[in-house]
């Protein structure tokens, strides 16, 4: 993947790399950041001697998506103080060590990549006290509302199998 797009592994492309290992049966390849690939790709990677399928930032990317979705809800509920995205932008703009070498572009492109890039460089900022405080403030804003919404959803599902 790249900061702004995912390159799908082409299972139909000629396998020019795997024959190298025919003389080295105890060796294998490592595929880096495979978590953005479609599940159907993994057997093809294994057949091509990619025995180590490393995952990358997809889990933290999904977590950020969920937090920002909740942040949008908090905006509708009239949160006090800055949004989570604003707090994270302040943090990342003030300390660029985790993203500056990974992203290029205009000021606006960099701002978008800091928050939404597939490399998910924002993940290195979540442990910071300011980020933790912003997440806590978000949850405090939503306290009661999310529980209320979940209770309504559970009443709708009662008696139905969860699929």
Give the location of each predicted region.
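Active-site-proximal beta-alpha loop/turn segments in soluble metabolic enzymes
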Residues: 1-6
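Structured alpha-helical segments in the cores of large, soluble enzyme domains
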Residues: 7-23
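Flexible, acidic glycine-rich loops studded with aromatic residues
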Residues: 18-163
């Amino acid at each position: 993947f790249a900061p702004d797009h995912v390159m799908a592994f082409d299972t139909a492309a000629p396998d020019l790399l795997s024959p190298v290992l025919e003389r080295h049966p105890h060796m294998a390849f490592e595929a880096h950041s495979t978590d953005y690939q479609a599940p159907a790709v993994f057997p093809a990677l294994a057949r091509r001697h990619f025995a180590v399928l490393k995952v990358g930032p997809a889990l933290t990317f999904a977590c950020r998506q969920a937090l920002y979705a909740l942040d949008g809800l908090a905006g509708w509920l009239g949160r006090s103080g800055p949004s989570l995205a604003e707090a994270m932008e302040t943090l990342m703009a003030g300390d660029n060590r985790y993203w500056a070498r990974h992203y290029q572009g205009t000021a606006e492109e960099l701002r978008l990549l800091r928050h939404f890039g597939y490399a998910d460089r924002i993940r290195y900022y979540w442990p910071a006290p300011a980020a933790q405080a912003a997440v806590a403030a978000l949850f405090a804003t939503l306290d009661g509302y999310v529980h209320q919404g979940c209770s309504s959803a559970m009443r709708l599902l009662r008696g139905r199998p969860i699929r």
